[in-house]
Every structure is written in structure tokens, then in C-alpha cells.
Amino acid sequence: MKHALSALISICQREGLRFFGQTGRLVAALVRPLIWLFVFAAGFRAALGLSITPPYETYITFETYIVPGLVGMILLFNGMQSSLSLVMDRELGTMRLLLTAPLPRWWLLTCKLIAGALMSVLQAYAFLAIAAVYGIRFPALGYLTVAPVLLLAAFMVGALGIALSSTIKQLENFAGVMNFVIFPMFFLSSALYPLWKMAEASALLHDICAANPFTHAVEAVRFALYVQPNWFALGVTVAAGLVFMGIALWGYDPGRGMVRQKAGGPAGS
């Protein structure tokens, strides 16, 4: 137990030092959603009307609606960015040292996932603070109730990133694979438009967005900010996170997963 906690603390410290040592990474993580908030949302405010739907009890501006979605964007991009370090560690050889430590492989990957999730939550709160200064505020208690939901959402997208990293052979391929995943997940969700708006445009588009686990992560965050639990969205988020983590563990299993295939298969082949 002591060694397991030491590994968790060490990996969290390593992730924190790497993150705070790259100030450009923090700035980039915040600039992206802020541009959406200040430019995109302001431009579409008059064109996109929003009806009163839960968790909202009155009409809201488009900026207010997309803030939870932009929080989800931060979690999504940082989860994928965090998995990039696994690809780098594999190329540098430090991944082998990590995975051969006298601890269960699932625990080491979970520690990596927890460390990345904590960094994502810090970025999300930094964005919420800027949004509050801009005038978009939520109930005071909502900033507390959203914390565990942010962790669960960050866990889900982080697990997806780790699962994908097990399939990437070279660092050069990372950007293409991540963009192939990030943009469909983000745009085919309720991050920017409510599902009922999607249904008005296309029933098929609505069904795709409703099946997207990122949609449920965003909705869980949205409801938590208004101190209203959305148990269905939370359940889907947790279930998707467990499935993605299971795929990640299989991918990093040297006997069965993608790591073995990259190494050239069994010794006798």
C-alpha cells in the first residue's frame, strides 16, 4: 500500500512539474476555449435562440450555455495531450522502466490517469474563474458540486487518450489520430448546441450526439454547476470511462495488447 501511494504521488508530481514547467501549454489550453467564448458565442448570440430546458430555469445567453461545453473541451484536449507523454515516454524508453516497476500495471496506468485528470480539473477551474470575471457565473455551491463530476469526466477522456496511445506507433502520428477523435467527439455533442436543436436539424444527427459519451460528460458538468445531479449522464460517463480504461489496460498488456504487437509479437515469431 505504501509503495502504491508513493507511485501515485511521484507520478502526480512528475505530471505537475511537466505541466507547470510548460507555461505555453497552460496558456494554449485556456486561449482555445476563451476564443470560443469571446468570439464565437458573442457572434452567434442573436442567431441561436435557446428555450428554457433543465437545468436552466430562465432564458440564458448562448455564452452561458456553452461554458460547460468549453469546460468539456478543456478536459478533452488535456486528456489527449496527457496521453501524448506516454507516446513520448515509449520512444525515449522511460515507459519500459515505468511498466516494469514492481507494482500492478493497472495501478501505474491509473496513477497516470489520476495525475492527468487533476491537471485537467485545475485548468477547468482556471477557465471558470475567467468566465466569472467575464460575467458568466454559476451558483456558489455549484463550483463545489462540479468538482467530482469534473474528475469523472476527465477520467473518461483521459482513459480514452491512454487507450488510443497504445495504438500509436510513432509520435508523428499522434496529431492525426487525436484530431480524428477530438473534433468529432466535440462537435457531435451537446457542447455547443442542445440536443433538441440537433433534433430539429436531423434525427440521425441527434441520435449520434446522444450516443456520444462526451455529450453525457458535458451534461453531467452542466447540471452539476447548477447543483442538480444528472444521474443518467453520470452513469454513462462512468461506464464509458471504465470501458476505455479496460481497452487501455488491454492495449498495454505485453501478452495481448498493442504494445506486444509493436514489439514484434512473441519471441518465437
Q: Model regions: which residues?
A:
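Transmembrane helix segments
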Residues: A42, A46-L48, S165-A211, T215
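Junction motif at the cytosolic side of a transmembrane helix
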Residues: A47, L225, G235-S269
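Short, membrane-interfacial amphipathic segments enriched in basic
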Residues: M1-Q13, V157, A201-T215
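Hydrophobic alpha-helical transmembrane segments of multi-pass membrane transport proteins
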Residues: I35-F40, I60-Y134, F180, M185-F186
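Alpha-helical transmembrane segments and their short interhelical loops
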Residues: R105-N179, Q228-G251
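Aromatic- and glycine-rich beta-strand/loop motifs that create alpha-glucan
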Residues: M1-R32, Q261-G268
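Short helix-capping/hinge motifs at transmembrane helix termini and TM-loop junctions
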Residues: F40-G49, F77, A131-P139, S166-Q170, ...
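Membrane-interfacial helix-loop-helix junctions in multi-pass membrane proteins
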Residues: R18, P55-Y56, R137, S190-V243
